[in-house]
UniProtKB/Swiss-Prot annotation:
Organism: Nicotiana tabacum
DEAD box (motif): residue ranges: 30-33
Domain of life assignment: Eukaryota
GO cellular component labels: cytoplasmic stress granule
Protein name (record): Eukaryotic initiation factor 4A-6
EC number: 3.6.4.13
Gene3D superfamilies: P-loop containing nucleotide triphosphate hydrolases
Signal peptide boundaries: none
A molecular function GO annotation: RNA helicase activity
Length: 253
């Protein structure tokens, strides 16, 4: 049997003996960096305290912050570290552009202008907070744009329904956060917009890779304010790419 759950739910099931620790042979912590950055550290530690000592543990993470390494030191016995070489992280097939936005509050107008210009099959818009997901969703709907939204504060059933609608094509625009970026596998996604640049260069690949999956071509457009210029530079250096300014003939992309 395989049990999949959030740290809080898994800990609760272990505590109530709905999951018997002595029967568990393997524990996998996926998206460890995101889990830790979202405040699940205490719950993850509580789970490890209830697990039997001789258990196989796998920790998967796009990045290796100190908090993730601390888990390997505290709870793993002679762990083997497997790293993916940076040259295996590819953005091939994805056209990447940026748009200079002088002020944060002008991003919304820029986004609406793009949607009036581009011919889009399906697209994903990334922001950095759950609150901003809700805010941008309300603003877009207020301008008669049909959009869906998903983030970690929604219950799993609601998120599943939204993703089914998006995969089926009945919903064409999805607004979300980094936490869910790595689980979006939709073949028809042709455009990713970083309304907010990611806070870490490593997450850029997980975001814009949504538009180039399954060998398809894709486009990513990054909104860049003055405060974002350093991160844009870091992203280009990290992936050894040049991100061009969005051309005037944007409709031809």
């Amino acid at each position: 049997h395989v049990v999949v759950g959030t740290p809080g739910r898994v800990f609760d099931m272990l505590r109530r003996q709905s999951l018997r620790p002595d029967n568990i042979k393997m524990f996998v912590l996926d998206e460890a960096d995101e889990m830790l950055s979202r405040g699940f550290k205490d719950q993850i530690y509580d789970i490890f305290q209830l697990l039997p000592p001789k258990i196989q543990v796998g920790i998967f993470s796009a990045t290796m912050p100190p908090e993730a390494l601390e888990i390997t030191r505290k709870f793993m016995n002679k762990p083997v570290r497997i790293l993916v070489k940076r040259d295996e992280l590819t953005l091939e097939g994805i056209k990447q552009f940026y748009v200079n936005v002088d002020k944060e509050e002008w991003k919304l107008e820029t986004l609406c202008d793009l949607y009036e210009t581009l011919a889009i099959t399906q697209s994903v818009i990334f922001v950095n907070t759950r609150r901003k997901v809700d805010w941008l969703t309300d603003k877009m709907r207020g301008r008669d744009h049909t959009v869906s939204a998903t983030h970690g504060d929604m219950d799993q059933n609601t998120r599943d329904i939204i993703m089914r609608e998006f995969r089926s094509g009945s919903s064409r625009v999805l607004i979300t956060t980094d936490l869910l970026a790595r689980g979006i596998d939709v073949q028809q996604v042709s455009l990713v917009i970083n309304y907010d640049l990611p806070t870490q260069p490593e997450n850029y690949l997980h975001r814009i890779g949504r538009s180039g999956r399954f060998g398809r071509k894709g486009v990513s457009i990054n909104f860049v304010t003055k405060d974002d210029e350093r991160m844009l530079f870091d992203i280009q250096k990290f992936y050894n790419v040049v991100i061009e300014e969005l051309p005037a003939n944007v409709a031809d992309l």
